[in-house]
C-alpha cells in the first residue's frame, strides 16, 4: 500500500514538474489578426459560424451510441452465463433483452429511425 501511495505521489510530482517546465519554457506570442483569421478565397466571412449542423444525423448518432453502449454492457453477461447457469442470470439477461427490444420498437414507432422526419 505504501508503494502504491509513493508511486502516485511520484507521478503527480513528475506531471507537475513537466507542466511548470512547459509554462516557463514556452514563449508568449502575440496573436496576429491576419494569421488567426480564416482564408476563404480572398473575402472575409460574414458570420463566425462553424460548419452546418445536421440534427437528424446527430440524433441517429446518439441512438447508435446508446445502442452500442447497451451491447457493450451485454457482452460480459454472456461470459458470466458460461460460468454460472442459475435462474437469476437467465432472468437478468431476459429482462435486459426485453428492455433493449422495447426501446428499439419505441424508436421505430416514433419514427426516430427515419433519416428525414
Curated annotation (Swiss-Prot):
One Gene Ontology term, aspect cellular component: mitochondrial membrane
Transmembrane segments: 1-21, 58-78, 86-106
Reactions the enzyme catalyzes: a ubiquinone + NADH + 5 H(+)(in) = a ubiquinol + NAD(+) + 4 H(+)(out)
Membrane topology category: Multi-pass membrane protein
Recorded name of the encoding gene: ND3
Cross-referenced Pfam families: Oxidored_q4
EC class: translocase
Entries under InterPro entries matching the protein: NADH_UbQ/plastoQ_OxRdtase_su3, NDAH_ubi_oxred_su3_sf
Native organism: Apis mellifera ligustica
One GO MF term attached to the UniProt entry: NADH dehydrogenase (ubiquinone) activity
Name of the protein in its database record: NADH-ubiquinone oxidoreductase chain 3
Function: Core subunit of the mitochondrial membrane respiratory chain NADH dehydrogenase (Complex I) that is believed to belong to the minimal assembly required for catalysis. Complex I functions in the transfer of electrons from NADH to the respiratory chain. The immediate electron acceptor for the enzyme is believed to be ubiquinone.
Keywords noted in UniProt: Electron transport, Membrane, Mitochondrion, NAD, Respiratory chain, Translocase, Transmembrane, Transmembrane helix, Transport, Ubiquinone
Main location: mitochondrion
The organism's place on the tree of life at top rank: Eukaryota
Family to which the UniProt record says this protein belongs: Belongs to the complex I subunit 3 family.
EC numbers: 7.1.1.2
Compartments where found: Mitochondrion membrane
